[in-house]
Each structure stands twice: as C-alpha cells, then as structure tokens.
Amino acid sequence: MNLNYLDFEQPIADLEGKIEELQLVGSGNALNLSDELERLRQKSAKQTESIYSNLTPWQIVQVARHPQRPYSSDYISRMFEDWDELHGDRHFGDDKAIIGGVGRIDGKPVMVIGEEKGRSVKDKVYRNFGMPKPEGYRKALRLMEMAERFKMPVLTLIDTPGAYPGIDSEERGISESIAQNLAVMSRLRTPIICTVIGEGSSGGALAIGVGDQLNMLQYSTYFVISPEGCANIIWKTVEKAPLAAEAMGVTSSVLADLGIVDETIPEPLGGAHRDIDAMALKLKERLVSQLDRLQAVPIEELLDTRYQRLMSYGNSAV
C-alpha cells in the first residue's frame, strides 16, 4: 500500500522516498545496497517513533481522520467469522452510514454495529461520509434490541464526523433517534462494548457509544464538537482549530485520565493504517478478553454497574 503522509510526517516521507529510489536503483543493476537500505529503514523507524511520541492533540485529530485509516468494514472482515449483514430500520430505509449484523468473534455470537465513512469518492457519497441519518440510528437500535432478545453481546465501532445535520435528517427526527438510542442502550439487558476507532464526534458518536466498556484506539479522538467547529464559535475562525483541540481534551490519554475512557488500545507505530492486520488482531484480543469478563457478570449487576458508570461522568472534573 502506498502511504499518504500528513504534513507533519514530511521527514518520514522524505526518508521513505529515498528508500524507494534505492530499491529501484538496486533492482536495475548488480549493486548491493542492502546495508544502506537497512540504515535508512532504521532511520525512518526512529524518525517515526520520535514524531509519534510527541504528537499534539491537533496532529492526533489528523491521524484519526487519515484517509487510509481502517474503517469499521476493515475490522469486521478481519475480526469476525460467519458475518451476516442486516439492513433497514423497518420505518424508512437502510442508512449505508451504519453497517450492522451478526457474526462470531472467537466462536462467540455477537451483534456488531459500526459507522462507515467510505474509502473512494463514490463510496463516500454512498456512505454519506459516515454521517448517519435517523434511519441509521434506528437501524442500530433495531439490531441492539434483537441482540437483547437473542442474548448476544453488542459491539459497536465508532467513527463519524457527526450525525447528518441536513433538513431531511431533522424532519425525520435525528435528535429523537439519538436520544432514544441513549435511553435504550443505558438499560439494554446484554453486555455492550463500544470502541472509538477513528473520529468520535458529538451525538453521532454517542448514539452508539453507551455501554459497559468504552475503548479508544491510541490515535482516535472523541469530542462534543469538531475542533474546527469549536474554533469557529469561540474565535470566529477555523485557524484556531489546533488551539481548540488542545483545550477540549480530545485524545484518548486525556479522556482516560478523566475516567471517561476505560481502555486505550495501542496502535502500530505510525498509526493503525500502517498495519491494519496487526491493529485488527490487537483489537480482537482486547474485545475477546473484555467479553469474557462482562459475560461472567450477572445481568442485574451489569446494569447497575453501567448506571453507576454513566452517573459518575464528570465527577473527576468537579
């Protein structure tokens, strides 16, 4: 895969460009460039480690939005067996920004619900750029209630710039659909594990984000409004977005310190898009472990713990 590099990754891009040039030169003649290639690879790895160990919140926002970052469909295809996608909300239609269905993880039947942004231009339009409408959240709700009936745990994968704010979305009750999901998820009688895999923005993320366990991938983000939106409201310019990202505390490390996030899952060096298979394997291992723990808890105790967990939000900031 040819990587796209972000602006702050330019030193890495320069080194990788030199490596590619040497590989082309070496393949065309008898020169032995293995030592020089190894030196450059080590230098590139050190440069990547140096940059990624000192990322600013705004840079992490950019990594979370990376165009090659794995989406819900990438994880589903790698982590679940016997996957069978389910469609429609039984009221209006089938929102392609939400994908959901039944599958098995480590042999355990689960209901999986994820937000999907789309990769190509055509797919982004098809998926509405990952911005669900009311029918998307009502589809998610239908699948969660089905999971409850069949005693299947629910796993959600969060990755959205927000719920779709268009007129048609408002006419069909986007705020009501989000609120209904929050209410039902808070008392759903089956384990729920939520994982932010990329961008978790506003009510669009919360609508599938209430559960017994909240994970964030290392370079994912979670916020009530995008840094650009916050900057535009407060400073009347999106140029202050980096400052807004710093002030809002959008990263997994900050949210873990606040007690909002239960676990931060490490990513491969340079982000999940550098090694999607390794990231999927790591996430699968953590989900299986968390499922084993939650399924061993009696349901009434699980619901009480979930309620107490929700009621504790904000205590660390008081």
UniProtKB/Swiss-Prot annotation:
Q: What PROSITE patterns does the record tag this protein with?
A: COA_CT_CTER (PS50989)
**One biological process term in Gene Ontology:** fatty acid biosynthetic process
Keywords attached to this Swiss-Prot or TrEMBL record, sorted alphabetically, are: ATP-binding, Cytoplasm, Fatty acid biosynthesis, Fatty acid metabolism, Lipid biosynthesis, Lipid metabolism, Nucleotide-binding, Transferase
For this protein, the Enzyme Commission number is: 2.1.3.15
Q: What class of enzyme is it?
A: transferase
Where, subcellularly, is it found?
Cytoplasm
Molecular functions per Gene Ontology: acetyl-CoA carboxylase activity; ATP binding; carboxyl- or carbamoyltransferase activity
From the UniProt record, list the reaction(s) this protein catalyses.
Answer: N(6)-carboxybiotinyl-L-lysyl-[protein] + acetyl-CoA = N(6)-biotinyl-L-lysyl-[protein] + malonyl-CoA
Looking up SUPFAM superfamilies in the UniProt record yields: ClpP/crotonase
Q: Could you tell me which InterPro entries the record lists for this protein?
A: Acetyl_CoA_COase_a_su, ClpP/crotonase-like_dom_sf, COA_CT_C
- Which ranges carry the CoA carboxyltransferase C-terminal domain? 32-293
* Family to which this protein belongs: Belongs to the AccA family.
PANTHER family in alphabetical order: ACETYL-COENZYME A CARBOXYLASE CARBOXYL TRANSFERASE SUBUNIT ALPHA (PTHR42853), ACETYL-COENZYME A CARBOXYLASE CARBOXYL TRANSFERASE SUBUNIT ALPHA, CHLOROPLASTIC (PTHR42853:SF3)
Q: How does it assemble?
A: Acetyl-CoA carboxylase is a heterohexamer composed of biotin carboxyl carrier protein (AccB), biotin carboxylase (AccC) and two subunits each of ACCase subunit alpha (AccA) and ACCase subunit beta (AccD).
Query: What name is this protein filed under?
Result: Acetyl-coenzyme A carboxylase carboxyl transferase subunit alpha
Q: What is the lineage of its organism?
A: Bacteria, Pseudomonadati, Pseudomonadota, Gammaproteobacteria, Cellvibrionales
Gene encoding this polypeptide? accA
